């Protein structure tokens, strides 16, 4: 499937071989790992902004749940680790529960609100500033 957006999106220099694994580290944490953000598509840009603002946060881009689940358990464990998970996805949270059952979720399970992209991100709390504040509290980061 080809999925397009009306929004301007940053090219994160994705490697096709990595994408074909279904999930991979797109941003490596600075310092000791404290948490892992799971995201996909255009939300990865916001996830990286959050991770750049906090030490110890890794961003994993999930390109395909089915392909990721087919990878060896050792690979999946290396990518996800046992650290707390944060899910950032402007769609349903449903697909992420098996990876982040006790995680912090920034998702949209309600639809029908109209507005510009900026207005909707603000309404749903999907701005780097709001997310950073909640992630700090969730991970008990000063």
Sequence positions of predicted segments:
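Thiamine diphosphate
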Residues: 1-142
């Amino acid at each position: 499937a080809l999925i397009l957006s009306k929004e301007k999106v940053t090219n994160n220099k994705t490697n096709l071989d990595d994408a074909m694994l279904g999930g991979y580290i797109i941003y490596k944490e600075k310092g000791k790992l404290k948490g892992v953000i799971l995201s996909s598509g255009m939300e990865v840009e916001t996830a990286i902004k959050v991770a750049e603002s906090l030490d110890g946060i890794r961003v994993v881009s999930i390109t395909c749940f089915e392909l990721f689940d087919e990878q060896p358990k050792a690979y999946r464990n290396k990518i996800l680790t046992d650290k707390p998970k944060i899910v950032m996805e402007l769609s349903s949270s449903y697909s992420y529960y098996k990876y982040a059952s006790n995680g912090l979720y920034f998702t949209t399970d309600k639809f029908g609100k109209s507005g510009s992209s900026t207005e909707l991100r603000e309404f749903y709390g999907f701005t780097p500033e709001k997310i950073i504040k909640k992630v700090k509290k969730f991970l008990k980061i000063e």
